Every structure is written in C-alpha cells, then in structure tokens.
Amino acid sequence: MRHRKNKHRIGRYGSHRRATLRNLSREIVEHQSIITTTKKAKAVKEYFEKLMTKAIKAKKAEKKEREVALRREIFKALGDRRLVNKLVDEIAPKYLDRQGGYTAIYKVGPRRGDGAEMSLIKLVIEE
C-alpha cells in the first residue's frame, strides 16, 4: 500500500522518472520556460527548486570548496557543465534575495491530441 508516500510518480518507474525530471530541468535552465503536462510540471517544480536553492548557495558560498561541492551536486542532477555554469553564474544571481518560489505554473488548456491538461512552467522574474 502507498499510504503517505507523497512523491510525484508521473506514471513512470524510478530511473525513467529521474531521467524525465532531469531532462525537464535541463530545458528550464536552457529556455527559462517549458510547456508540459500539469503533473510533470508539478513534479519538476519540486525537483528544480531544490537545484535552484543549491545554485544560490553556491553563488553565496564564502569558501571555494563549498561552491565546488554544490556545483558538483548540481552537475550530478543536470549532467551538463555548460548548464551548471548558466544556472549558477547567470540565473542564480537574480534570485539571491528570494526565499523559494523560483518557478510558477500556469495552466494553458488541454493538449490537442489526447486532451491531457497542459501547463507552462517558467522562472519567476522580478522587475
């Protein structure tokens, strides 16, 4: 029984779910917004916000060793050095004073082919 197991499963087994979340996170870093199903958007929001928190901590790190360790953790999640640098050096500085809530989900209606509920997930940009 799955009582009190609150992980977003998105209809996939473990390694497939991790790969999906990794790919969606990479797309968010690269394009700052993506359109996906609402369930996947909610799952990737949780995953990506943890990465964003690590990126902000890496940017604020006083010791070089701590920054390198956090960058390696982000690399483990994203798998691309270029995206790690973009996240830590370009995106994270915009959110240094923000305590979470780095992404927002907006519903955009049903998908044409099968009627699945689609959502836009994007980085929140403060002016």
Curated annotation (Swiss-Prot):
InterPro entries named in the record: Ribosomal_bL17, Ribosomal_bL17_sf
Gene: rplQ
UniProt protein name: Large ribosomal subunit protein bL17
Species, as recorded: Thermosipho melanesiensis (strain DSM 12029 / CIP 104789 / BI429)
Coiled coil: none
Family the entry assigns: Belongs to the bacterial ribosomal protein bL17 family.
Domain of life the protein comes from: Bacteria
One example GO MF annotation: structural constituent of ribosome
Keywords: Ribonucleoprotein, Ribosomal protein
